[in-house]
Amino acid sequence: MNLTLKESLVTRSRVFSPWTAFYFLQSLLINLGLGYPFSLLYTAAFTAILLLLWRTLPRVQKVLVGVSSLVAACYFPFAQAYGAPNFNTLLALHSTNMEESTEILTIFPWYSYLVGLFIFALGVIAIRRKKENEKARWNTFDSLCLVFSVATFFVAPVQNLAWGGVFKLKDTGYPVFRFAKDVIVNNNEVIEEQERMAKLSGMKDTWTVTAVKPKYQTYVVVIGESARRDALGAFGGHWDNTPFASSVNGLIFADYIAASGSTQKSLGLTLNRVVDGKPQFQDNFVTLANRAGFQTWWFSNQGQIGEYDTAIASIAKRADEVYFLKEGNFEADKNTKDEALLDMTAQVLAQEHSQPQLIVLHLMGSHPQACDRTQGKYETFVQSKETSCYLYTMTQTDDLLRKLYDQLRNSGSSFSLVYFSDHGLAFKERGKDVQYLAHDDKYQQNFQVPFMVISSDDKAHRVIKARRSANDFLGFFSQWTGIKAKEINIKYPFISEKKAGPIYITNFQLQKVDYNHLGTDIFDPKP
């Protein structure tokens, strides 16, 4: 048979081989399983790599396929909720223990695990493929695969260079290589941030207090968790689930924007002094109150991993008195209720104090899974049980605020209380009976959170519509408590209708993004 014709037939048989289709499907699922958007280019290029390796280095191909399939299978449920690895996901990995990890695993829909098993099964099939007895000659198809896969490797680096960036081979868009790079780079950034945090947390604060004129005897900061503003009736939600906040005399901020989309990053930027985008962990609102002569208390229902290893722990340990409902690791006992914190505040308020008091309560609030917070209870069904429980967590927090307010009124001391949430959440599996909410950074609702101030001398229920940013929280804290410090630049009166200027948030890639450029994730009230 003519050699050219024979080579043409071999090429055609390989192009239309079931294994070519198999590797294409596997490449596609690995791409999606690692959290990256579908790309026909990289799916086809990775298929070409697998075909080439099978021809030349079959054992290497099996290792690559096996490892990639295993990682993609395990990561697939997370990828659908959180996307590709970034600073936030690696930070969460560092600051989450087995208990919370187990809880997170139960929130993903069952079919995410089914797809993960399917990806793993494809990997097993690929590994078990028998080697061909006769090694075929190198042909045109092999050359095309080689040229195509190598050329694709340079696409992203060349694009970066063309768009004013730097040409780096490590920026290749191949999902497998990109995943490894994203994990390594972001993990190094997290470790560097934690080392810097530990160093600064052990240092003395650098506040220069210039005046201390508190209006009230007791100040209370209640830090909520994962509450998006449109889930609370008092802040424009469709449900009458916050009767206390909706009616109490005080200030409702209708447009308060969180600093970031996760607890550690958001509160790190909110509660600490920030210089060039980096939190100065030694200079936070607790050390400022200490420096001003306040007595400080920190009561938490979020547990404590260690003394310095999270932004919250580094702040909490600076208070004069610190108590955690959960002994030991974060969420060591997920059944502890936020309401138990009121036993601690009752003890503090029952005592007489000569100094001004700052009491901080850190809630579990609406942290996923919401049904674990409510023991499966909800009042109004909306789309899914988890969504319905999420709405009910707002009622639980509202009831806690009511009881805390009553404690403060009965104490006989003048007081002011501020409540806000660290960040919001976004809907996943929208419109399905498994709909749930998880961390995200793409939508305005991830940053739209409640913020309210209730004081003992308030005479009316008022709403402030001017937009406010959590990046200016220390400015608010200074004005609220009457503590002036040289390091705090007051840009505008926080409790006013004066405009605050453009507002930026910090996304999970640690980039500053204009809040107005974010998408929307509407809370559909349909049952």
Curated annotation (Swiss-Prot):
The residues exposed to the Periplasmic compartment are 1-33, 84-106, 168-527
Specify whether Cell inner membrane is a keyword of the entry.
yes
Q: Where in the cell is it found?
A: Cell inner membrane
The answer to whether the entry has keyword Oxidoreductase is no
Q: What is the protein name stated in its UniProt record?
A: Phosphoethanolamine transferase OpgE
Q: For this protein, what is the EC number?
A: 2.7.-.-
**Looking at the record's lineage, which domain of life comes first?**
Bacteria
**Can you tell me which family this protein belongs to?**
Belongs to the phosphoethanolamine transferase family.
Instruction: State what this protein does.
Output: Catalyzes the addition of a phosphoethanolamine moiety to the osmoregulated periplasmic glucan (OPG) backbone.
What is an example of a Pfam family matching this protein? Sulfatase
For molecular function, the Gene Ontology terms on record are: phosphotransferase activity, phosphate group as acceptor
List all topological domains (Cytoplasmic): 55-62, 128-146
Pathway given for this chain reads: Glycan metabolism; osmoregulated periplasmic glucan (OPG) biosynthesis
Which residues span the membrane?
Answer: 34-54, 63-83, 107-127, 147-167
Q: What keywords tag this UniProt record?
A: Cell inner membrane, Cell membrane, Membrane, Transferase, Transmembrane, Transmembrane helix
Output the Gene Ontology cellular-component terms.
plasma membrane
GO terms under biological process: lipopolysaccharide core region biosynthetic process; osmoregulated periplasmic glucan biosynthetic process
Q: How does it sit in the membrane?
A: Multi-pass membrane protein
Q: Please state what class of enzyme this protein is.
A: transferase
